[in-house]
UniProtKB/Swiss-Prot annotation:
InterPro entries: CysI (IPR011786), NiRdtase/SiRdtase_haem-b_fer (IPR005117), Nit/Sulf_reduc_fer-like_dom_sf (IPR036136), NO2/SO3_Rdtase_4Fe4S_dom (IPR006067), NO2/SO3_Rdtase_4Fe4S_prot (IPR045169), NO2/SO3_Rdtase_4Fe4S_sf (IPR045854), NO2/SO3_Rdtase_FeS/sirohaem_BS (IPR006066)
Species whose genome carries this gene: Escherichia coli O9:H4 (strain HS)
This protein's name: Sulfite reductase [NADPH] hemoprotein beta-component
Enzyme class name: oxidoreductase
Pathway: Sulfur metabolism; hydrogen sulfide biosynthesis; hydrogen sulfide from sulfite (NADPH route): step 1/1
Family: Belongs to the nitrite and sulfite reductase 4Fe-4S domain family.
Functional summary from the UniProt entry: Component of the sulfite reductase complex that catalyzes the 6-electron reduction of sulfite to sulfide. This is one of several activities required for the biosynthesis of L-cysteine from sulfate.
Keyword terms of this UniProt record: 4Fe-4S, Amino-acid biosynthesis, Cysteine biosynthesis, Heme, Iron, Iron-sulfur, Metal-binding, NADP, Oxidoreductase
Binding locations of [4Fe-4S] cluster: 434, 440, 479, 483
GO molecular function, one term: NADP binding
Pfam families: NIR_SIR, NIR_SIR_ferr
Cofactor: how and how many bound: Binds 1 siroheme per subunit.
Cofactor: siroheme; [4Fe-4S] cluster
Listed GO CC annotations: sulfite reductase complex (NADPH)
Length: 570
């Protein structure tokens, strides 16, 4: 993409304030421990507001009541979001019971939110419950270390219940990569788990004293499923198997979706193929990619700091050669692989180990007891009797994994009685939104609360045009940071202002093409009017098996994005 315009390896200039904050934090300690005891405010002050992100938390407030509280001369109702570190999304039933209890007793909203990063979040943790939540997680073998800010975030792994042996091997690598790239500072253990301060000096041999320039996301992918959306991530290991056994990985680097409205220096980007590596080099290569980005990433501008921008600035071949040098290997040519879809297989699937796996559709990943649909209670009851584990998917759904034939009926009965197996349309199964309002401070428009009724309307359009048995990969994200992964959807809505979105078209079903903006700053009725016409055309004019996104490109409705660094904004 960018060999024509290689730029400097290191960007000179004044460092951002985030770099100062990290340097002065004493390896992420700051004054968080002291701040915990300050009862005058429900939030964290100064640098601690940002430092807690390295410990897996974001400070938020309820935006629905922000103005009302301001009128009453009250500070915003501060509460923390906590995101668990859960490589590959696998969680034991014992762990599930513990998080269910905490969510019900110690959060404002009482819910568990499954995320498209294959983990769960608690929303609405008051300051007094912040230390207890970390201690609860630790008591069941979990933590929230490095699930936010400038680190390698939660490592994703394809939730593939068919190929159980291959999934087991890939999952082990996801865990190994996660552990290898964790920060070494003892700050987390000292602050949250009351572990003794050790006299030795902290060192961060991989991440460095100021950690990474920006967030960094990693996946392990098992083709033909691209459920984890590899092109949204900085570093991707695509599993290559021979005779059902994992032998190595294709490496793809430099994906990412975050943009800024109107800032043409920002762009979504698909990941670049570097080559194939045998298994034994996996950790060395992972470390080499991370340290290259650590040293070459832009620390003068956080909006231009992610790996995708580093690749474009220095050139893919230059970055790749540096990874080879640091890892002491030469990449082999990419091995053949292909993707056929991204969705989860809802319902029962039999694995090759004679165990059954039940994938439950959880709309927007929000687990709560609703009237007539006690989802949270139902999952708790299943957790009490299920001998296998649960797996959170990157589509915000939940797999009850490893169910023996003898237990199927019992688990299905609870799931059905709890509304966990209610029939939904293919369109709803393939739609997703980020959290957005009321808790996300960056939200510009509704997403999670908007999606269910929006999909009701889309379902009506699909029925009107005779394509109810089909689906379009459709996603809503409340702001251009892109947590809802709308910039890899066939139809992506990106929040612009309350009730208004940019409509993007032209992505594809398998998630390998960035969609282009079709209409800007439009309302739901305008979106539906556009989609009514386009779905009608797709229903009539498509070729056999042609997805909606591919159709919009072939029919000339939208120009495909071929090189997003140069043509996304054209």
């Amino acid at each position: 993409m960018s060999e024509k315009h290689p730029g400097p390896l290191v960007v000179e200039g004044k460092l951002t304030d985030a770099e100062r904050m990290k340097l002065e934090s004493n390896y992420l300690r700051g004054t968080i421990a002291e701040d915990l005891n300050d009862g005058l405010t429900g939030g964290f002050k100064g640098d601690n507001f940002l430092l807690i992100r390295f410990h897996g938390m974001y400070q938020q407030d309820d935006r629905d009541i922000r103005a009302e509280r301001a009128e009453q001369k009250l500070e915003p109702r501060h509460a923390m979001l906590l995101r668990c570190r859960l490589p590959g999304g696998v969680i034991t039933t014992k762990q599930w019971q513990a998080i269910d209890k905490f969510a019900g007793e110690n959060t404002i909203y009482g819910s568990i939110r499954l995320t498209n990063r294959q983990t769960f979040q608690f929303h609405g943790i008051l300051k007094k419950n912040v230390k207890p939540v970390h201690q609860m997680l630790h008591s069941v073998g979990l933590d929230a270390l490095a699930t936010a800010n400038d680190m390698n975030r939660n490592v994703l792994c394809t939730s593939n219940p068919y190929e159980s042996q291959l999934h087991a091997e890939a999952y082990e690598w996801a865990k190994k990569i996660s552990e290898h790239l964790l920060p070494r500072t003892r700050a987390y253990a000292e602050i949250w788990l009351d572990q003794e301060k050790v006299a030795t000096t902290d060192e961060e041999p991989i991440l460095g004293q100021t950690y990474l320039p920006r967030k960094f996301k990693t996946t392990v992918v098992i083709p033909p499923q691209n459920d984890i959306d590899l092109h949204a991530n900085d570093m991707n290991f695509v599993a290559i198997a021979e005779n059902g056994k994992l032998v190595g990985f294709n490496l793809l680097v430099g994906g990412g979706l975050s943009i800024e409205h109107g800032n043409k220096k920002t762009y979504a980007r698909t990941a670049s193929e570097f080559g194939y590596l045998p298994l034994e080099h996996t950790l060395a290569v992972a470390e080499a990619v991370v340290t290259t980005q650590r040293d070459w990433g832009n620390r003068t501008d956080r909006k231009n700091a992610k790996t995708k921008y580093t690749l474009e600035r220095v050139g893919v071949e230059t970055f790749k050669a540096e990874v080879e040098r640091r890892a002491g290997i030469k990449f082999e040519p990419i091995r053949p692989y292909e993707f056929t879809g991204r969705g989860d297989r809802i319902g029962w699937v039999k694995g090759i180990d004679d165990k059954w796996h039940l994938t439950l559709f959880i709309e927007n990943g929000r687990i709560l007891d609703y009237p007539g649909r006690p989802l949270k209670t139902g999952l708790l009851e299943i957790a009490k009797i299920h001998k296998g584990d649960f797996r959170i998917t990157a589509n915000q759904n939940l797999i009850i994994a490893g169910v023996p034939e003898s237990e199927k009926a019992k688990i299905e009965k609870i799931a059905k009685e709890s509304g966990l197996m209610n029939a939904v349309t293919p369109q709803r199964e393939n739609s997703m939104a980020c959290v957005s309002f009321p808790t996300c401070p960056l939200a510009m428009a509704e997403a999670e609360r908007f999606l269910p009724s929006f999909i009701d309307n889309i379902d009506n359009l699909m029925a009107k045009h005779g394509v109810s048995d089909e689906h379009i990969v459709m996603r809503v994200t409340g702001c251009p940071n892109g947590c809802g992964r709308a910039m890899l959807a066939e139809v992506g809505l990106v929040g612009k202002a309350p009730g208004r979105y940019n409509l993007h078209l032209g992505g594809n079903r398998i998630g390998t093409r960035i969609p282009r903006m079709y209409k800007e700053n439009i309302t739901e009725p305008e979106i539906l009017a556009s989609l009514d016409e386009l779905i009608g055309r797709w229903a009539k004019e498509r070729e056999a098996g042609e997805g909606f996104g591919d159709f919009t490109v072939r029919a000339g409705i939208i120009r495909p994005v071929l090189d997003p660094a140069r043509d996304l904004w054209d």
